[in-house]
Amino acid sequence: MTVKTRFAPSPTGFLHVGGARTALYSWLFAKHMGGEFVLRIEDTDLERSTQEAIDAILEGMEWLGMDWDEGPYYQTKRFDRYNQLVDQLLAEDKAYKCYCPKALLDELREEQMAAGVKPRYDANHPKIVAANAAATEDSAFCIRFRNPKEGTVVFEDKVRGRIEIANSELDDLIIRRTDGSPTYNFCVVIDDWDMGITQVVRGEDHINNTPRQINIYKAIGAPVPEFAHCAMILGDDGAKLSKRHGAVSVMQYRDEGYLPQALLNYLIRLGWSHGDQEIFSMEEMINLFSLESISKSASAFNTDKLLWLNNHYIKTAEPEYVAKYLQWHLEQKEIDTANGPKITDVIGLVGERCNTLIELADQSRYFYQDFSEFEAGAAKKHLRPVAKDALALVLSKVEALEEWNTENLHVVIADTCTELEVGMGKVGMPLRVAVTGQGQSPSVDATMMLIGKERVVNRITMALAFIAEREANA
């Protein structure tokens, strides 16, 4: 039997970290087992579902690199199938029409809560019996599933072990609303059956739905899949994860300069582990992942840890991989890389100093864009009259260079220090500010090499003019 998992988000909001982790676990298990991964959009909530949210979910999945083998399927395009199964259950007396008005149900719910009783639908309540008896052909009705009254529902959760619920704890679930639309708990069963889903991986907030859904599987004669319910993700303060903890949409992490691999590596560790290992390649994730290794305990979201992972991948990933995602940030900042060094060379030089791709894009700017002003603090400290001789000598030497490479530029700087009998800082720091416009950069010789001879000459010339003007105004 082919293993088949699915990710089935509701498009009532963007793809957030909790949903992304669920998708990742489902995707990894399918890949690990040589199976298939299905993407399904559960858009039966017609009032809250939006095309914007659907687009954001698809974009987030694509950005993370979680490709799907089937789909995306849309529940709103399967209403005929759901109605077919509702009619079948009605014909088999496994479902029935309920004419009880919402106002009465709300009233009874309030009475139960006031009495400290778990709110649930009671088909035998006198008021409900009376409401159904008073119905006419024109009365509005919903369809309820006739849940078994005796026995228990038992299933072996792949994360939590054996779970057992008495049927007496479950009420008769609405499977079709008064407006004719099917409900979540019914649709998900039909979809998972039709799509051949063998393992359902989802959040622990769905545990209460599972016994209800299992009874529907049995009523329609469908095989029951295995279930794995993952613990919640909490903030680092133990509270429910929210925006202040970093619970933002996946695409916001892209916008803030995170690499997909860093986020995936972080998400897999939020509830799963393999010894003390922290860094996992995609191949390792797929080979090592198992549902049984998912923790039963809630995980705490730590933005600092995610940032550390992002820095790790910027430093160690193949420059071509980083460049693929850096390019988007460069374009957002209107940095044209057509006239300048290869992006991969810049990443190799600057990447180690950056925690995010935004920082990397900012640190890459001076390789591609000229500037008209120097960073004020750096210029005040280093572009002083005392630096004039060093910059002038470097300028004459670089203009005379026939081969533009890091080694020759290193010799230029070293020879300048020797001839002027000054330390490296007296030459290197003014030169760094001159060619980059700022006080911090990687090694100045390697930086100059990538900036290119023409730009270096022009910028040192501009720095000398800045010093001359400063001297004149002193």
Swiss-Prot record:
Subcellular location: Cytoplasm
Molecular function terms, GO-annotated: ATP binding; glutamate-tRNA ligase activity; tRNA binding; zinc ion binding
E.C. numbers: 6.1.1.17
Sequence motif 'HIGH' region, residues: 9-19
Domain of life: Bacteria
Main localisation: cytoplasm
Short name of one Pfam family: Anticodon_2
Binding site for ATP: 243
PROSITE patterns per UniProt: AA_TRNA_LIGASE_I
The keyword Cell wall biogenesis/degradation belongs to this UniProt entry's keyword annotation: no
Main function: Catalyzes the attachment of glutamate to tRNA(Glu) in a two-step reaction: glutamate is first activated by ATP to form Glu-AMP and then transferred to the acceptor end of tRNA(Glu).
GO process terms (BP): glutamyl-tRNA aminoacylation
Subunit structure comment from the entry: Monomer.
UniProt keyword annotations, A-Z: Aminoacyl-tRNA synthetase, ATP-binding, Cytoplasm, Ligase, Nucleotide-binding, Protein biosynthesis
The family this protein is said to belong to: Belongs to the class-I aminoacyl-tRNA synthetase family. Glutamate--tRNA ligase type 1 subfamily.
Location of the motif 'KMSKS' region: 240-244
Protein name: Glutamate--tRNA ligase
Catalysed reactions listed for this entry: tRNA(Glu) + L-glutamate + ATP = L-glutamyl-tRNA(Glu) + AMP + diphosphate
